[in-house]
Amino acid sequence: MKIGVLALQGDYLEHAQLLKELGVEAVYIKRSEQLREVKALIIPGGESTTIGNLISQKGLSQAIMKYAEEGNPVVGTCAGAIILAKKVVDRAVGETGQPTLGLMNIAVTRNAFGRQNESFEATVYVEDIGEVRAAFIRAPVISDAWSPARITGYIDHPAIGRVGVAAKQGSLIAVSFHPEITGDMKIYEYIISLVKK
């Protein structure tokens, strides 16, 4: 089985390593034609504006949208969740106008938990997946979801309260956190299960 990891910027190497540990061949996606090789796609964390710009510059936008519309699983982690969202605001500056794929009916707030030094780890219960040990690094929150998307995971944060950190829309999944940093395999096992259906 081959699963793609978008390899334009961000922590794609860490995702690929965990996939390899599960016996899956990770394909570093840099060109649209590579999507034909893979059964699912992970859009990693990194810098969401940079990733969005590179997707556009490399001519990947239409290819990824078509890939998702064909029902292939696409998972966005942290910045990847921002890339999947229809609406993006920043905690400090408001509307960002940044390029996204807009595939999921979700709104996200960038940097919702604060700066890098306010990063933390938490255990999150995500519907269909279970408890996941998650790292939140300058992470977004999923502030809204509308049909057919739904929020599937929440955390209670001492500073900002109960917030959405996972969402699902068909075979599209967005998570605010970095599962690849904690090494928790449950997200990857779930992606594999979606491919095998």
Predicted segments, located by residue:
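Hydrophobic anchor at the start of a short beta-strand
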Residues: 26-27, 74, 172
